[in-house]
Swiss-Prot record:
Reaction equations catalysed: 5-[(5-phospho-1-deoxy-D-ribulos-1-ylimino)methylamino]-1-(5-phospho-beta-D-ribosyl)imidazole-4-carboxamide + L-glutamine = D-erythro-1-(imidazol-4-yl)glycerol 3-phosphate + 5-amino-1-(5-phospho-beta-D-ribosyl)imidazole-4-carboxamide + L-glutamate + H(+)
UniProt-recorded name of the protein: Imidazole glycerol phosphate synthase subunit HisF
InterPro entries: Aldolase_TIM (IPR013785), His_biosynth (IPR006062), HisF (IPR004651), IGPS_HisA/HisF (IPR050064), RibuloseP-bd_barrel (IPR011060)
GO BP annotations listed: L-histidine biosynthetic process
Complex formation: Heterodimer of HisH and HisF.
Pathway: Amino-acid biosynthesis; L-histidine biosynthesis; L-histidine from 5-phospho-alpha-D-ribose 1-diphosphate: step 5/9
Length: 258
């Protein structure tokens, strides 16, 4: 059995790490490189960096900090933000990133997933999915351009259908960003995770809602996700990564200890 992964998420805007609630009202957390170093030292298995306004601004992720991060950490990291071409992805990988993640550009042009997978291999192609539960319809809907409040919009895709489509086109991993839960720390949406797990045959990463060690345990035990991504609980020192891993190990979760 592969070890489960604990993945701090660093949302990047204007060269700094920020954090919002339900993808809104972002506050500045700190500088990118020191935070990356901190999490690598504290026992993170992997890091994810999202340039949250790149797609809505019509630009690719700011590459200036990627090389610096690669120089100071020795764990894998993934970079996302406005990657629209095979060349964009190649540059980011050449600067030291281990994976690239695409979200809004894949919704605009789903063939991008296949072209990236064909060029670089499915193992380094992640598809991020921003999903919102609409109480009025009882459906999970995929949203696009979520880094910009003015441009955020619902797409034609229901979440389960897009998960299937992304895999069919070559996604090697799915990160499910559950927007309703983002930053509120009341737990991952286990109902949604279980539904997605049933149709997701590549590694699945839960994102949005972690507030306590038990929330990570629930995601691993009840929804059988491969990794759990979180931000505010790590940024604000609410949860210590090593202590979290010790707790999960004691509860029978296969995980790399610090």
């Amino acid at each position: 059995m592969l070890a489960k992964r604990i993945i701090p998420c660093l949302d990047v805007r204007d060269g700094q790490v920020v954090k919002g609630i339900q993808f809104r009202h972002h506050e500045i957390i700190g500088d990118i490189v020191p935070l990356a170093q901190r999490y690598a030292t504290e026992g993170a298995d992997e890091l994810v960096f999202y340039d949250i306004t790149a797609s809505s601004d019509g630009r690719v992720v700011d590459k200036s900090w990627i090389t610096k991060v690669a120089e100071v950490i020795d764990i894998p990291f993934c970079v996302a933000g406005g990657i629209k071409t095979v060349e964009d992805a190649g540059q980011i990988l050449s600067f030291g990133a281990d994976k690239i993640s695409i979200n809004s550009p894949a919704l605009t042009d789903p063939t991008l997933i296949t072209r990236l997978a064909d060029r670089y291999g499915v193992q380094c192609i992640v598809v991020g999915i921003d999903t919102w539960f609409d109480e009025s319809t009882g459906r999970y809907q995929v949203y696009q351009f979520t880094g910009d409040e003015k441009r955020t919009k619902a797409t034609q895709w229901q979440t389960l259908n897009w998960v299937k489509e992304a895999q069919h086109r070559g996604a090697g991993e799915i990160v499910l960003n559950m927007m309703n839960q983002d930053g509120v720390r009341n737990g991952y949406d286990l109902t949604q995770l279980k539904q997605v797990r049933d149709v997701c045959h590549v590694p699945l990463i839960a994102s949005g809602g972690a507030g306590a060690p038990e929330h990570f345990l629930d995601a691993f035990k009840q929804a059988n996700v491969d990794g759990a991504l979180a931000a505010s609980v790590f940024h604000k020192h609410i949860i210590n990564i090593c202590e979290l891993k010790q707790y999960l190990s004691q509860q029978g979760v296969e995980i790399r200890t610090c």
